[in-house]
Amino acid sequence: LEAAGYKVAIVPQPDWHGDFRDFKKLGRPRLYFGISPGAMDSMVNKYTANRRLRSEDAYSPDGRHDLRPEYPSIVYSNILRQLYPDVPIVLGGIEASLRRLTHYDYWKDCLRKCILCDAHADMIIYGMGEKQVVSIAQELENGAHIKDLKHIPQTVYLCKEDDIPSGINEDDILLHSHEACLHNKKYQAENFKHIEEESNKKHAQRILQAVDNVYAVVNPPYPTMSTAEVDAAYDLPYTREPHPKYRGKTIPAYEMIKHSVNIHRGDRKS
């Protein structure tokens, strides 16, 4: 975003208790809020496989385990919606990517709907998001409304059936509705198969799922980035350091990876 000429304000691990002052520290954004709950799935990071609270968060200063809520994308988004009701909210990162359609929640032992429904956010960027964040910023700067951004690849949004671009057509994959999956486990299994297959295709189809009288629409991903595009992203002058807020504190995960190099990129599933 900075390379494209935009200013980015980063608020790390805001305090979600009390008066929400952390969410107001840097004021109202000109274009949109972007929410990412972290490099690891937030619930895996917070709980063990036995559903016990972990004693340490390797991604937090001094390993503290109490600096992020459960499902931070949902918590942060609802707070921002309360404070700035008319500012667009875009979810990204592994938490939203893996919850973009009906999904099984291991900790609640139930099926949950597309995370946009609970977070009251406007859009999800799934997978790697270098192109989408810039495209969204450019569209909003040119006067587009967030609800009209239905054409950006590798994004997810909710809309009514009549507002789906080109309508539901034979090239789309129409999944069983969320409500149907709640009553039939086989429907969820069939959905999961389609989602996995499309996530691994070079040329994927658009996926739609009915939920709460609207549709979750998953646009196909961007084509694989070229060598020049990958180099352009990774050659930017990153500091590769923790946020200045954590100066003087130890972040266990950073100590482990601070001399590491990238050898691969995340896939389009997450």
Indicate where each model-derived feature is located:
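Generic, well-ordered alpha-helical scaffold segments in large soluble proteins
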Residues: 4, 79, 83, 136-140, ...
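N-terminal [4Fe-4S]-dependent radical SAM core
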Residues: 190-263
